[in-house]
């Protein structure tokens, strides 16, 4: 072997100080999932999955997670553009507020939502008095709770993509007579589509697994607010086998959806 080939082979070799921690991290992530599959009650799984409550909770989870993601897109993308493309006093403070739900315990987020949108809340009392709208302990409340915890993932992803995108394309469009909104819609949005897609996937995954804010703000009512994570928690108290079966369903759905969307959007990127 020539010296140049040996040098190239050495350059491609994975350093042991990086390989060992990487394998430990991979094992840490995979072992709990493997344990879930190994300890699953496979013989009784068909009976567990035949329960109407399972599919009711799964259907509600998918509906609420998708609705929360769409709501996050509608308000989150403009918010990310505002943070990335405009200068205004207190922008850093606003950015900190947007990312606060990432570090806030979900239960605290649920309490905050109750104080804001509950029947006696700052906003909720007026919604109830003027329009007869009650949000807590409803399916809409589940969507709001999931949006609260999931939207920061979308905003961070889209803002990062906007900062990496060259603003001169947008400026050129406005120079040619396009309004700033038209330039955003026709030029900027197609450029940042992969970042928007990645943020939407992260938001959807976070919404699908949301527990703390949901049970605090929306409760745990089968058919109305009981999503899959809540159903797993409830089953774990009385029927661990059912909890494992529900966990497997949620795991399978999450892997299938996220893997499919990731491959599709990574190719588009």
List the predicted regions and their residue ranges:
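Short glycine/proline-centered loop/turn elements that form peptide/ligand docking sites
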Residues: 165-169
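Membrane-water interface segments at the C-terminal ends of transmembrane alpha-helices
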Residues: 9-43, 52-163, 187, 191-212, ...
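Short, intrinsically disordered terminal tails adjacent to the first/last structured region
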Residues: 1-4
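Short hydrophobic, aromatic-rich alpha-helical segments embedded in or entering the lipid bilayer
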Residues: 221-236
């Amino acid at each position: 072997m020539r010296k140049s080939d040996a040098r190239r082979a050495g350059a491609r070799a994975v350093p042991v100080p990086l390989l060992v921690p990487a394998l430990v991290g991979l094992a840490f992530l995979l072992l709990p999932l493997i344990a879930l599959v190994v300890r699953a009650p496979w013989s009784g799984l068909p009976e567990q999955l035949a329960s109407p409550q399972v599919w009711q909770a799964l259907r509600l989870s998918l509906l609420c997670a998708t609705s929360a993601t769409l709501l996050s897109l509608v308000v989150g993308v403009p918010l990310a553009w505002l943070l990335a493309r405009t200068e205004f006093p207190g922008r850093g403070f606003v950015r900190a507020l947007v990312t606060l739900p990432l570090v806030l315990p979900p239960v605290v987020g649920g309490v905050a939502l109750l104080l804001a949108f509950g029947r006696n809340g700052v906003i909720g009392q007026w919604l109830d008095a003027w329009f007869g709208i009650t949000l807590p302990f409803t399916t809409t409340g589940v969507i709001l709770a999931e949006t609260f915890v999931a939207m920061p993932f979308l905003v961070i992803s889209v803002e990062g993509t906007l900062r990496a995108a060259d603003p001169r394309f947008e400026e050129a469009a406005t120079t040619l007579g396009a309004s700033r909104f038209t330039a955003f819609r026709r030029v900027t949005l197609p450029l940042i589509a992969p970042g928007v897609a990645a943020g939407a996937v992260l938001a959807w995954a976070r919404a699908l697994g949301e527990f703390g804010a949901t049970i605090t703000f929306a409760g745990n009512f089968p058919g109305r607010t009981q999503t899959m994570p809540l159903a797993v928690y409830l089953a774990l108290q009385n029927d661990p086998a059912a909890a494992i079966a529900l966990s497997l369903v949620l795991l399978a759905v999450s892997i299938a959806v996220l893997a499919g969307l990731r491959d599709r959007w990574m190719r588009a990127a």
